[in-house]
Amino acid sequence: MAAEREPPPLGDVKPTDFEELEDGEDLFTSTVSTLESSPSSPEPASLPAEDISANSNGSKPVEVVLDDDREDLFAEATEEVSLDSPERELILSSEPSPAVTPVTPTTLIAPRIESKSISAPVIFDRSRDEIEEEANGDIFDIEIGVSDPEKVGDGMNAYMAYRVTTKTSLSMFSKSEFSVKRRFSDFLGLHSKLASKYLHVGYIVPPAPEKSIVGMTKVKVGKEDSSSTEFVEKRRAALERYLQRTVKHPTLLQDPDLRQFLESSELPRAVNTQALSGAGILRMVNKAADAVNKMTIKMNESDAWFEEKQQQFENLDQQLRKLHASVEALVCHRKELSANTAAFAKSAAMLGNSEDHTALSRALSQLAEVEEKIDQLHQEQAFADFYMFSELLSDYIRLIAAVKGVFDHRMKCWQKWEDAQITLLKKRETEAKMMVANKPDKIQQAKNEIREWEAKVQQGERDFEQISKTIRKEVGRFEKERVKDFKAVIIKYLESLVQTQQQLIKYWEAFLPEAKAIA
């Protein structure tokens, strides 16, 4: 019936129309009386609008008549929902109350202090995160470079030393720019110290580059050739990326061992870093034992977030390994293409020298020069494939292993807490047996043990909650850094591909007139 009736013009709305609406207020008397804490409003003209907004759910004609003023009506209605001194809210506050959506009367008259108790921690967390991001911006004001690889010593006692240069404006360092000499074992020793301090409490410690016995043996005993030079450059770049990722971590940057590594001219010799040593074999045994324990521990995961993230990192690890294998194959094919292009250029040059036709001989010689330039382009692109893309994938494969490592430590922490609960239950059963057997001398001992294990259970619960909280924060930071790193590398990689193709076009366009000049 309301849809069939013609809506009157907006200018024809009279106070009588509002009086007809106000006749139905007795249906919502309790709600309106509850919301209105004072009978007199500072603005009398707003009273009809407030009544209409309160009853708009039950009368369609009102919505049709006042369609153009709907925004004003709802704005005034939202100002009335506050129970914290309504007169003061109407006079001083121009912002809408948190309760914006019209709901049931019981929800509308809920005390406002409840909404404050929910929103206050969120605001506090947000401001704390903003402060931390600002602090991280200052913390990241540090540049680290690894350069000048130098062979020290002869024979199997030789090692490579690298210059670590640091530029920073942070007050924690004594100078704004300094450099030190470090060998590869020093980097491994630094990672070992940081991992022993922070890994078991949930921090993701960037892994150091892996040792290569074959590559380093060739550098020690062999002469300088292309393979040795490539190995040294690959290790130098990996060490530089390792330090850059480490100093980006706000907690690790504060560590005294890291500052000593960057500043001290002399470091104590790092021990237990050799691959073929007793400590190295012990590490391998411990890794195998951890793998077995991981299979035997059945953790009842109650947090869906951790279960989802673990599955996500497992899938990401598999896909990264597949992509890394494909990129390595691409690098090999690109190097093979470069070698074949060089052979083609040499053959074209020899053919041009033996050709009697002058124009054809000149064109073949020019073709050989172009192919030599293209050979150089293929080599540069192969290096870009490797150092830009392949090494990034390799780094993140090892970083994901570190992420899975902190998940394993969380599982160990849960297992320790679970074992403490089981032991406490056994102690209480023992106490009950002593009381039944009426052995007062052992009852007191059992009570002391119960108090001891209750403290261990509480500590285990606190440790588990803390490591879970830390891992959540660390995974969030890791995801942001991962997206940022992949974006930067993909853009650089695409730019290198575009530049290579553009250079190829220039080479062939320059050669085209020589080919057309053959008569």
From Swiss-Prot:
GO cellular component terms listed in the entry, alphabetical order: cytosol; early endosome membrane; endosome membrane; lamellipodium; lysosome; membrane; retromer, tubulation complex
Reported consequences of knocking out the gene: No visible phenotype. Mice are born at the expected Mendelian ratio and are fertile. Mice lacking both Snx1 and Snx2 die during embryonic development, around 9.5 and 11.5 dpc.
Binding residues annotated for a 1,2-diacyl-sn-glycero-3-phospho-(1D-myo-inositol-3-phosphate), in chain numbering: R183, S185, K211, R235
InterPro entries found in the cross-reference section: AH/BAR_dom_sf, PX_dom, PX_dom_sf, SNX2_PX, Sorting_nexin_N, Vps5_C
Gene3D superfamilies listed in its UniProt record: Arfaptin homology (AH) domain/BAR domain, Phox-like domain
Keyword Membrane: yes
Subcellular compartments: Early endosome membrane; Cell projection, Lamellipodium
Keyword RNA-binding recorded: no
Membrane-binding amphipathic helix as annotated region, ranges: 278-295
GO molecular function: epidermal growth factor receptor binding; insulin receptor binding; leptin receptor binding; phosphatidylinositol binding; protein heterodimerization activity; protein homodimerization activity; transferrin receptor binding
Phosphothreonine, modified sites: T101, T104
Skewed-composition ranges (Low complexity): 30-50
Domain BAR: 299-519
Residue ranges of the region described as Disordered: 30-62
Residue numbers bearing the Phosphoserine modification: S97, S117, S119, S185, S277
Gene Ontology biological process terms from the UniProt entry: intracellular protein transport; lamellipodium morphogenesis; retrograde transport, endosome to Golgi
Modification N6-acetyllysine, positions: K469
Location of the region described as Interaction with RhoG in the Swiss-Prot/TrEMBL record: 260-519
Keywords: Acetylation, Cell projection, Endosome, Lipid-binding, Membrane, Phosphoprotein, Protein transport, Transport
Superkingdom: Eukaryota
This protein's domain notes: The BAR domain is able to sense membrane curvature upon dimerization. Membrane remodeling seems to implicate insertion of a N-terminal amphipathic helix (AH) in the membrane.
Protein family: Belongs to the sorting nexin family.
Protein task: Involved in several stages of intracellular trafficking. Interacts with membranes containing phosphatidylinositol 3-phosphate (PtdIns(3P)) or phosphatidylinositol 3,5-bisphosphate (PtdIns(3,5)P2). Acts in part as component of the retromer membrane-deforming SNX-BAR subcomplex. The SNX-BAR retromer mediates retrograde transport of cargo proteins from endosomes to the trans-Golgi network (TGN) and is involved in endosome-to-plasma membrane transport for cargo protein recycling.
Subunit structure: Predominantly forms heterodimers with BAR domain-containing sorting nexins SNX5, SNX6 and SNX32; can self-associate to form homodimers. The heterodimers are proposed to self-assemble into helical arrays on the membrane to stabilize and expand local membrane curvature underlying endosomal tubule formation.
Protein name according to UniProt: Sorting nexin-2
Organism: Mus musculus (Mouse)
Gene transcribed to yield this protein: Snx2
